[in-house]
Amino acid sequence: IHLALEKDLGKSAFESYMCETGLVLSEITYMLRHIHSFAREKRVWTPLAQFHSRSYKKPCPYGVVLIMSPWNYPFLLTLDPLVDAIAAGNTAVVKPSAYSPHTSEIIRTILQECFEEQYVSVVTGGRAENTCLLNEHFDYIFFTGSQAVGKEVMQHAARYLTPVTLELGG
């Protein structure tokens, strides 16, 4: 992982660990520690008109999540949202950036070894693959990247009223 990040971005092993792999490991540890409390039904306030009832909030997965990640923190910003999506009970399609090819290949290898394709799929490629993915229907889209591409993601998501998380940069 560190070698791929060095080849793609010139990151040292220390920076790779502190800014990418260490944070992913921390997120995995956090989710494993708290997943049962996150998945539990929570009792909430019931309006007076329904005084004979009890109200609950029950977490429920979206379904298939599309995760599109950027080139600058390719390991962290691909796997961090994936950890959360899987912990929430979703399946995922992961699209790492074409601009960090060595890291994208490591991500693809790791995910293919750890998950069956029906749970987590990896799509590599450039803009053509991004467009093909966005023309498909997903239940949730998590995108990190530029404002210009974020607008395109939002337009495609609007066709299906797909909820999105956009983490946009300059």
Segments the model singles out, each with a brief description of its role:
Residues 10, 33, 37, 112, ...:
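Generic secondary-structure signature for well-ordered alpha-helical cores
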Residues 9, 25, 32-42, 66-72, ...:
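Generic hydrophobic/packing signal
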Residues 20, 99-103, 167:
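Short acidic-hydrophobic sequence patches enriched in Asp/Glu that either
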Residues 46-114, 161:
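Conserved small-residue-rich beta-alpha loop and adjacent elements
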Residues 64, 114-170:
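Conserved NAD(P)+-binding/catalytic subdomain of aldehyde/semialdehyde dehydrogenases
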Residues 2, 24-25, 31, 104, ...:
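A general structural signal for well-ordered alpha-helical segments in protein cores
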Residues 1-56:
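N-terminal Rossmann-like NAD(P)+-binding subdomain of aldehyde/semialdehyde dehydrogenases
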